[in-house]
């Protein structure tokens, strides 16, 4: 295919700028003729979100799911959150890079935006992750809109330049990345993210959330919506996960980045820290440790960036530095070593994945409760 040089690039750029100025003038003239009520309504739409209403919806949803305690993939959890808040938040503009059905970003409240109809709230971006992320930056820059867009976590690499600019410019953009680990199973190493979470967590001013159940998903979405000057990544599982929330509270447990899920004794000698799907594994490990007369504490850390900003007293309360600290995540361990101290251990995967049913892949990489218990027993003996 011949590549034609852009001889008129500067001229075309100026033409487009002139067209934009003309459209802006026309818009301002129309707005100037509207009554004050409409002007105030527009200003509120652009600058103010009705978080009181959103907060009530989220709290009501937390109560509902505390009663039913559903087991579901967190990509499904995220879809339920979007569905519950979208009608009360018209600023929310969703989309996906050709993976709406897999990311679960499109709900029954979604109305597709097309070239013939801009009166919608959902964009089919096609297979163009970088273009999607760039477009979301544009939507967030000056419009009052809160864009979110979905793809697989492995394809976040295609979004990376625009994610970096979201963070650099301090934009309220929400990236929905599903299929977040070896838990996706048979698709194998080409689709199993290993280094992606660690890489995303290294970007300044970017909150990377990895919720473990519906309660954490609701809370991570709440934080992301309120983060006016910080973009968010919400990494979600393909596989079903159990409900792990220990108690019903209106307060946001994820708001400090990490919290205690379960404690078998105040004399615990081991702290098990995990995120997302591995919180289930930590709880299974805790149960087996207790059967072997070893008390432990399970901590969920849905957001490193927020937890790292807490004071030392809270960090010590959560981590208990005198304990043997074991971190568990089905991905690169690079971003976990800061938590383990001198005698702890980070468990994860620092090689490419394998194609097999997901439980077999976890076993292959020694991420099972039985293997972790044996490891803890050996560490305690030493």
Protein language model regions, located:
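Thiamine diphosphate
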Residues: 2-4, 93, 100-197, 217, 219, 226-382
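Conserved acidic/glycine
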Residues: 2-128, 138, 271, 275, ...
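Conserved thiamine diphosphate
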Residues: 3, 7-15, 141-144, 168-169, ...
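Short alpha-helical segments and helix-capping/turn motifs at coil-helix boundaries
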Residues: 75-84, 158-162, 218-222, 310-314
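Generic, well-ordered alpha-helical scaffold segments in large soluble proteins
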Residues: 81-88, 95, 102, 135-142, ...
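Short coil/turn connectors at secondary-structure junctions
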Residues: 88-92, 117-121, 142-146, 169-174, ...
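General beta-strand structural signal in soluble alpha/beta enzymes
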Residues: 95-96, 125, 148-149, 175-177, ...
């Amino acid at each position: 295919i011949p590549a034609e040089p852009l001889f008129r690039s500067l001229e075309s750029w100026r033409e487009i700028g002139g067209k934009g100025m003309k459209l802006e003038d026309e818009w301002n003239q129309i707005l100037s003729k509207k009554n004050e009520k409409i002007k105030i309504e527009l200003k509120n739409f652009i600058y103010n979100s009705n978080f009181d209403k959103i907060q009530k919806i989220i709290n009501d949803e937390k109560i509902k799911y505390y009663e039913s305690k559903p087991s579901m993939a967190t990509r499904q959890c995220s879809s339920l959150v979007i569905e519950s808040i979208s009608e009360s938040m018209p600023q929310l503009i969703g989309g996906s890079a050709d993976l709406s059905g897999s990311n679960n970003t499109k709900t029954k409240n979604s109305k597709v935006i097309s070239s013939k109809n801009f009166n919608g709230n959902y964009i089919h971006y096609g297979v163009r992750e970088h273009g999607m992320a760039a477009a979301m930056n544009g939507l967030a820059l000056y419009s009052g809109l809160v864009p979110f867009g979905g793809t697989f976590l492995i394809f976040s690499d295609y979004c990376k330049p625009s994610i970096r600019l979201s963070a650099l410019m301090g934009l309220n953009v929400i990236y929905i990345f599903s299929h977040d680990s070896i838990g996706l199973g048979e698709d194998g190493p080409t689709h199993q993210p290993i280094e992606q979470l660690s890489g995303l967590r290294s970007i300044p001013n970017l909150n990377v959330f990895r919720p473990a159940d519906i309660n954490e998903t609701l809370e991570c979405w709440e934080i992301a919506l309120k983060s006016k000057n910080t973009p968010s990544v919400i990494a979600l599982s393909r596989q079903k996960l159990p409900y792990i929330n220990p108690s019903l509270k209106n307060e946001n447990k994820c708001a400090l980045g990490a919290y205690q899920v379960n404690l078998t004794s105040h004399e615990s000698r081991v702290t098990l820290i995990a995120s997302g799907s591995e919180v289930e594994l930590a709880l299974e490990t805790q149960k087996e440790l207790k059967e072997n007369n070893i008390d432990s504490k399970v901590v969920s850390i849905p957001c490193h960036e927020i937890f790292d900003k807490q004071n030392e007293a809270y960090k010590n309360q959560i981590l208990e530095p005198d304990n043997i600290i074991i971190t568990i995540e089905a991905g690169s361990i690079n971003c976990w070593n800061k938590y383990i101290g001198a005698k702890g251990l980070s468990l994860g995967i620092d090689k490419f994945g394998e194609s097999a049913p997901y439980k077999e892949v976890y076993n292959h990489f020694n991420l099972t409760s039985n293997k972790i218990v044996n490891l803890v027993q050996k560490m305690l003996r030493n």
